[in-house]
Curated annotation (Swiss-Prot):
The active site is at D287 (proton donor). Component of the dark-operative protochlorophyllide reductase (DPOR) that uses Mg-ATP and reduced ferredoxin to reduce ring D of protochlorophyllide (Pchlide) to form chlorophyllide a (Chlide). This reaction is light-independent. The NB-protein (BchN-BchB) is the catalytic component of the complex. Its cofactor is [4Fe-4S] cluster. SUPFAM superfamilies: Helical backbone' metal receptor. Keywords: 4Fe-4S, ATP-binding, Bacteriochlorophyll biosynthesis, Chlorophyll biosynthesis, Iron, Iron-sulfur, Metal-binding, Nucleotide-binding, Oxidoreductase, Photosynthesis. It catalyses: chlorophyllide a + oxidized 2[4Fe-4S]-[ferredoxin] + 2 ADP + 2 phosphate = protochlorophyllide a + reduced 2[4Fe-4S]-[ferredoxin] + 2 ATP + 2 H2O. The keyword Metal-binding applies. This is Light-independent protochlorophyllide reductase subunit B. Belongs to the ChlB/BchB/BchZ family. [4Fe-4S] cluster binds at D36.
Length: 546
């Protein structure tokens, strides 16, 4: 473990909390010290859930370590069952509680409770959040659905004639990126195909619902990071086929419809005929051409990163210049996707490595997590969030799915708008020194109310006073500012910039300004120039343009 200001995934017990909180009738008792009790903060402040998470803590203190901490856990478990009346109880330790080795599973079973007790062995120092969520969901599914599983080798009974096919939607959890909205979009899409949804799990499911998973005709894997382990067990135990195409983007949604139709034996035409797409007409318009070929850097969980890479290249006409994930369990899939794009995949959970890769790639747009939003803001690059972990603004009150045809429309808005607003911002930056548009100029439509004490020279074109934003460059979005562009600091012995060249550099769009600065400094250094003038800037542009 290491000390850091940011982590893409929490310890595995956070994944268990996400599953327990997403479900009904499940409670999770965690053997943990006082400092590990952060579930309320995660689920009520960030996700803005209306109720408290289904998590209880032993909350032992330092003075308790010399006493019987096992008794504390048994008391906490018994109290949680008496108070919350769950249908199933999850028990486990936090990363700190794991060190005292009290065996929560054995202690809970010794209580002789009348409900299923599911012990979670989550190695906090080897695994992380998504693995913990997948393992918790698998343990729940196997415990609740296992008794109904047929004997090995038993053929699956055919669906009764006249009965609509039924499926399970597996993978959505609490604190997931747009999981609630994705479920709504996919349920509606399946309904248009004549397919009923038997169970959605873990989100909104109860232990009794998990016991019915084997009754469905097939399973739909919405989020492999969470559902894959459980789905593989359901395939073996019940002989259920699985639909694994994740319907993010237009092409993937059509492929998803085709796969569901093949598995369920239904006609895909109704779902394809009711496409609610607004993307194709815009893609054929003249306005779309100036976004073609934009350079995009993508980082997130494997499911969303791979889907974003496909959508960016095949549907938006973008050029993917970087692709990575923090989910090492899916490194193989991401490397295959990156290799098809001629890239080397970035597999890391260190945000500093991601920041360095983004700075080196000089993208026009960053698609990532909450941390990439911060990185892009610091580098002066437009950004859109496509993956967890996210903050409160990515749990909107409105419906904003990522999956299905409606999700494709949301992707279009989310990805294109930052680029278009970036162009507008560039125009504002270009003209900010103009006598009519500088920071201290009064709005032109309020000229009748202009203060009388201003110098008449302003109206005849005398140079205005330095705008306030130039006095504090670190607070601007100008890529030439020291804290907005990591290349701004000139190393010792490097050519210095003349004021006129700095002013001309600010006319370069902010999303390529850092690259223009570095290329110009390299051009000047190779020719032994002590200073960089406007002529040097344009000579460097011509040189690298060739």
């Amino acid at each position: 473990m290491r000390l850091t200001v940011w982590t893409y995934e929490g310890p595995p017990q956070v994944g268990a909390m996400r599953v327990a909180t997403a479900m009904r009738g499940v409670h999770y008792v965690v053997h943990a010290p006082q400092g590990d009790s952060y579930a309320d903060l995660l689920f009520t402040m960030i996700e803005r859930r209306p109720g408290r998470p289904a998590v209880s803590y032993t909350s032992f203190q330092a003075r308790d370590l010399g006493t019987d901490t096992a008794a504390l856990f048994k008391t906490a478990a018994a109290d949680a069952v008496a108070r919350f009346q769950p249908e199933a109880l999850l028990v486990g330790s936090s990363c700190t509680g794991e060190l005292i080795q009290d065996d929560p599973g054995g202690l809970a079973k010794a209580l002789g409770l009348s409900i299923p007790v599911i012990p979670l062995e989550l190695p906090s120092y080897q695994r992380k959040e998504n693995w913990g969520a997948a393992e918790t969901f698998y343990r729940l599914v196997r415990t609740m659905a296992g008794p109904a599983a047929p004997a090995p080798g038993t053929p699956r009974a055919p669906r009764p004639a006249g009965q609509r096919p039924r499926c399970n939607l597996l993978g959505p959890t609490a604190l997931g990126f747009r999981h609630r909205d994705d479920v709504q979009a996919v349920v509606a899409l399946l309904g248009r195909m004549g397919v009923d949804v038997a169970v959605v799990a873990p989100l909104g499911a109860s232990p009794a619902d998990l016991a019915r998973l084997g009754e469905a005709d097939f399973n739909v894997v919405l989020y492999p990071e969470i559902a894959d382990t459980a789905v593989r067990w359901l395939e073996r135990a019940f002989g259920q086929p699985s639909v694994r195409t994740v319907p993010i983007g237009v092409g993937a949604t059509r492929a998803f419809i085709a796969e569901v139709a093949a598995v369920a034996g239904v006609d895909p035409a109704p779902a394809l005929a009711e496409e609610s797409l607004r993307l194709p007409w815009w893609s054929r318009s003249v306005d779309s051409t100036y976004l073609t070929g934009k350079r995009v850097f993508i980082f997130g969980d494997a499911t969303h990163a791979v889907a974003a890479a496909r959508v960016a290249t095949e549907e938006f006409g973008f050029e993917v210049v970087g692709l990575g994930t923090y989910a090492r369990e899916y490194a193989r899939e991401l490397r295959a996707c990156a290799g098809a794009l001629g890239l080397e995949a970035l597999i890391t959970d260190d945000y500093l490595d991601v920041e360095a890769a983004i700075a080196d790639a000089h993208p026009d747009l960053v698609l990532g997590t909450q941390m990439e939003r911060h990185i892009a803001k610091r580098l002066g690059v437009p950004c859109a969030v496509i993956s967890a972990p996210v903050h409160v603004q990515d749990f909107p009150a409105r419906t904003a799915p990522q999956m299905g045809f409606d999700g494709a429309n949301v992707l279009f808005d989310t990805w294109v708008h930052p680029l278009m607003m970036g162009l507008e911002e560039h125009l504002l930056m270009m003209f900010r020194d103009d006598f009519e548009f500088h920071g201290d100029a009064a709005p032109s439509h309020l000229s009748a109310h202009r203060p009388t004490g201003e110098a008449v020279g302003d109206a005849v074109g005398e140079p205005p006073a330095a705008p306030r934003d130039q006095a504090a460059p670190a607070a601007t979005l100008d890529g030439s500012a020291a804290q907005s562009d990591p290349a701004r600091t000139t190393p010792p012995g490097a050519p210095s910039w003349e004021d006129s060249a700095e002013k001309e550099l600010r006319k370069v769009p902010f999303f390529v300004r850092g690259k223009a600065r570095r290329n110009t400094e390299r051009f000047a250094a190779e020719r032994g120039l002590a200073s960089i003038s406007v002529e040097t800037l344009y000579d460097a542009k011509a040189h690298f343009g060739r």
